[in-house]
Amino acid sequence: MLYRWSDDYGARLGVLRRDDPFGPIRWFNIDPCYVFHVLNTVDKTTDDAELVVLQAARYSELWRDDGAHGFDAVMWSWTINLTRGIVSEEQIDERAVEFPRIDDRLVGIPARYGVTVGTGKLVRYDLERGTAEEHGFGSATEPGGPSEAVFAPAHSGAGELSGWYLSYVYDPVRDGSDLVVIDASDFRGKPVARVQLPQRLPYGFHGNWIAG
């Protein structure tokens, strides 16, 4: 293995101002962890502080040995107080998830909904209410395996619930993949479309929606 977890190293977040891209990076120590994928990061201002809020799928550790690694990241939030030079962090949920995505039009600004991939399901978080709902695939004994869900808005001015989530889903019955389309306004309902693909796509397959 090219790299391995070490308890001798810590973890930190770096903040570079967007209005000063050649300026210094401010570093903030956080509890040891590993992050592959970020949901979103937004700037917030209160009466007495300038804040940066980062939300991501967090592993408590990874690559400690050469064996197989579990799918055990959980959604986490870090609030960086730039004024006081401190960081607070909290766990958002206990579900094991990965590949968090929001409506791409809202990257860097507050988004209400974030969708993640769990085992045999998609999990959508309502970041305003602090709740979550699931869309399952397949059966309990042979669940389908979804990949990262991408939001396709119904039109350029559509809200976060006016559009569809697109996910490649592995079908273990036929050993192939489908492109599954879910109505964002009925997340737990049946898919509105399912397109069989001529071959299986690997798990973790990334994608983006580009309007034609």
Regions found by a protein language model. Name each.
Residues 1-212:
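Beta-propeller domains
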